């Protein structure tokens, strides 16, 4: 196993990142195993409608990397604090090389519980990658809050 450490230039300070102040292994390094096909990355978009700020708008983009025999399926479930699924979707993963980019259609949630500092309402997103027999091969997730920040007249 090899670990490559970069030393950045003094110009890296423009991005205000600490990589120009530090070099070497300064943080924890993790090594973990993944299945042959796995969820490499995902982006959640959770905002409120622009008219009344009551309806939640949920979007999800996922990158699946690797390849698997047969047809894999990607599923998500958005659950409230009681564990009740309020959104669910499942689609087949079409193998198009080693990286597959999947975008789910935006979904609307009426009367969503909004997130704020005073009322930090969070939903749980569960992502599951299943093999052709329906067995879960990779599972991940995160907490999701619905809010909108904007500047307007």
Regions found by a protein language model. Give the residues of each.
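Secreted/periplasmic carbohydrate-active enzymes, especially glycoside hydrolases
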Residues: 1-153
């Amino acid at each position: 196993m090899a670990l490559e450490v970069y030393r950045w230039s003094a110009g890296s300070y423009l991005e205000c990142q600490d990589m120009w102040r530090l070099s070497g292994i300064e943080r924890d390094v993790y090594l973990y195993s993944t299945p042959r096909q796995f969820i490499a990355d995902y982006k959640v978009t959770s905002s409120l409608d622009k008219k009344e700020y009551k309806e939640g708008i949920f979007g999800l983009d996922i990158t699946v990397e690797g390849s698997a025999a047969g047809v894999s399926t990607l599923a998500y479930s958005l659950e409230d604090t009681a564990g009740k699924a309020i959104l669910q979707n499942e689609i087949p993963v079409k193998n198009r090389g080693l990286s597959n980019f999947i975008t789910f259609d935006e979904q609307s949630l009426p009367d969503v519980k909004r997130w704020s500092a005073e009322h930090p309402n969070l939903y749980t997103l569960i992502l599951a990658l299943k093999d052709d027999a329906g067995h879960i091969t990779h599972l991940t997730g995160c907490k999701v809050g619905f809010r909108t920040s904007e500047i307007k007249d």
